[in-house]
Amino acid sequence: MRCADGALYEIKLHGKNGCMAYREGLQSGARKQLGFAFKDVSEHLPGAFIIYRAHKEDDELFYANSEFLRMAGYKDLDELFRLTQKRFRNLIREDERQQMEQSIWEQIGDGNENDYIRFHLRKADGTYLSVLDHGRIVDSQQYGRVFYVLFADREEMRLHYSEQFPQ
């Protein structure tokens, strides 16, 4: 049974569809990679991200990781949801909102699964933070079409990567 278990995990590391016979040396340290839960990854990933419904009229926020909450000054998800009415568009500065939404949907409409925008993100205290936004649209079995969006603080990027991207 232990040998079959080892072969099964080796196959899982290379995709879902496949089979193989056990052979010596399959017990690798790679097996540990399968043990990361979503919460472990989302809370320790060095990047801010959110997940929201990919719909022009109903852009409901589903999730924001702790890095996003910290960056934008929200105490917790409840405060984020309350102050934004659970809408992605309410994170975008009002005078930029229409242009940013149009840009996202034009990029997606051109057959891309990724979009790239730059805007001012509304923080919990009402101030704004200039951010870079990299979104990806995916089909979720549970929620339908959703966006996974990574955010980077433009000023932090400039400070930490100024040598890599000279002015």
Where are these regions (language model features)?
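Sensory-domain cores of signal-transduction modules, predominantly PAS/LOV
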Residues: 7, 18, 47-52, 118
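PAS/LOV and related PAS-like sensory modules
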Residues: 32-56, 159-167
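PAS and related sensory helical modules
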Residues: 62, 69-90, 97-98, 102
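Short loop/turn elements at sensory-signaling interfaces that couple input to output
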Residues: 13-14, 133-161
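Conserved hydrophobic beta-strand signature of PAS-family and PAS-like sensory domains
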Residues: 58-62, 128
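Cyclic nucleotide signaling catalytic output domains
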Residues: 2-14, 20-33
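PAS/PAC or PAS-like capping segment
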Residues: 25-26, 95, 153-158
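Per-ARNT-Sim (PAS) sensory domains and their PAS-associated C-terminal
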Residues: 95, 99, 109-136, 142-146
